[in-house]
Amino acid sequence: MYVSVAVMDTGIFRHMDFDTRIAGFADFVGRKKYLYDDNGHGTHVAGIIAGSGKGSNGKYRGIAPDTFLVSVKVLDKSGNNLCYPLKWYIWHLR
């Protein structure tokens, strides 16, 4: 069974702790098609959730290290947010 968590934040940088477990990406700020994080906060949150510990030789792991991530960029580099992505997410839960 696979579990995915949507990280609705500033985006996610590729990182050795979860790079192979990024299941999707949507950018509602810059409309870019590639994975990025222009602030770093979203990547930090992703590590807390799903970090495998690979980058720290097992010293630092997330609370669910086998979880897949879906990066939903809803915050710009200054942390400002948008309402539309939340409506999109709720619509797709149906």
Task: Tell me the role of every PLM-derived stretch.
Residues 1-24, 32-84:
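Subtilisin-like serine protease catalytic core
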Residues 82, 86-94:
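Cationic, amphipathic, low-complexity alpha-helical segments enriched
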